[in-house]
Amino acid sequence: MAHNNLQTIAEREASILAPYAMHSSDTLGRCYDEQQQSYRGPFQRDRDRIVHSAAYRRLSGKMQVFTGDMGDYHRTRLTHTHEVSSIARTLARALRLNEDLVEALALFHDIGHPPFGHAGEDALAKCLETEGGFSHNQYALTIAEQLETRHQHFPGLNLTQEVLAGQATRVDKSAPEISPLLEVQAVEAADSMTYDAHDTDDALKLGLVKFAELEQLDLIKICQQQIASRVDELGEREYQRAIIHTLLDCQVTNVLEHTSTALANFQWDSASAARQSDFRIGTVGEIAKAKKQLEAFLYERVYRHVAIVKTRELAQRQIQQLFAVLVKNPEIMPIRFVEHGEQVGLPRSVGHYIAGMTDRFFEQQFLAHVSR
């Protein structure tokens, strides 16, 4: 039965996917051998394992950029992840890539983020600077390979080599000998487009920037031109919503037009052949230039906003304080992290414990063990 179903999956993918896509039948498999299932392919299983993991559920309690003190409209790591998955699957379907693999990669890409976003990551990197530092991308691999437990005979989620390798490209940003799979590139492009749009949206809603400031940016002007060509008149709220929607749409359109043309010219006959090229899925031309301008604006006017900086500095101080307490008093941690410390060293285990916390649970632990 399992063999027949996998044959069906292979036949379906052969009819739908492009030759340059990663076909499920070509997977390098998992670290630990498992019996194949009759109703799911390997990347479908990866997706489901990620979604059902504790680390994935905790993303709902981790801030993206803005904290819960600023309201409850803005994105969390989980909503960001869902938005990335949505855009990445759109790219995959249009480009005839493996949508199951793309979805698994997208749902997995931010699973290693600690509490309080990049402020938390910077704080843990400081705490662990003599131990090799801290990277949320590397921690995602630690979660998948060590910390999550789903089987009595082996550690981790036992994801496919393709998902693990895709995440590994986020750890080491240096130019690889061979390019990442096109599915990995699609997720990277979707991630970038998504946070540009939703950070702009959240910053507007929270009053950190004014719409008049955004109107000075080239990418917003392009969006305005596109809206004017198809809509006569909109109210203020509807117009701003249309801008955010078009901000995504114009980037997705740019990526698909450029990539579709390039893929037709390359005529790769396999995923391996595509990896021999230095081609990258992403925005190009006027849109790419305008995108960089928007990102520079967000960096200066939003990410370095006094309210955001104040929150970052507080979070970093508190994480460093709790880290110091836990290193001196490891018995505070759950026993499995004490045992984990015997394998990776106590400081690293403390870092892993804190990195797995939601914002709220961190605050509870801080109040209980530091601010008492």
Residue locations for each model-derived region?
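Aspartate-rich (DDxxD/NDxxD/DxxxD) Mg2+/diphosphate-binding motifs
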Residues: 102-129, 137
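Short coil/turn segments at secondary-structure boundaries
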Residues: 71-79, 92-93, 108-115, 128-131
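Histidine-centered, transition-metal-coordinating active-site segments
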Residues: 1-81, 85-91, 98-99, 134-372
